Amino acid sequence: MKYGVVLFPSKKLQDIANSYRKRYDPNYALIPPHLTLRTPFELTDLEAAEVVSTLREYAKNASPITLRIKKFSSFAPVNNVIYMKVEPNEEIMALNERLYADPLEGTPEYAFVPHVTVAQKLSDDEHSDVLGTLKLRKIDHEETVDRFHLLYQLENGSWTVYETFILGEEG
């Protein structure tokens, strides 16, 4: 089964993201706005149990994460994804790094850029128009997220929460 690890931002930030996603993101119906901490990976049921135990330890030893967003950006020319750029901080970078260690071993395909996607799979012209409009929009958002989630993918392509991990909490 395919799994992934994400942070879900506040409803306020999700509403901002969704105001664009419903028009510009074909994955809008498959997963709420999120910040991907670990790209999707395959696990058996037995491996999933081990990973849950490991993630519980990671969470216990981590602190809540501050998300600061001050602008929209894009991964162009690599791809036409437009996102709200989350300013990197020690907590989020450390958690991302841990999520590629044992037992979740793997090598990220790209350098980790904390972000919340608002548009993807756009034509070059549409990407240019949407990004130009969003870069004119002021955004100054800060919030603290105290949990992350292990998700799994259903047969229809949508993602659902398998387990939630509270940052800095025993248990």
UniProtKB/Swiss-Prot annotation:
Keyword Cell membrane among UniProt keywords: no
GO MF, one example: hydrolase activity, acting on ester bonds
EC number: 3.1.-.-
Motif (HXTX 1): 34-37
Entry superkingdom: Bacteria
Active site residues according to the UniProt entry: 34 (proton donor), 115 (proton acceptor)
Motif (HXTX 2): 115-118
Record Pfam families: 2_5_RNA_ligase2 (PF13563)
Keywords noted in UniProt: Hydrolase
Classification via HAMAP family: 2H_phosphoesterase_YjcG
Protein name: Putative phosphoesterase BPUM_1117
Biological source species: Bacillus pumilus (strain SAFR-032)
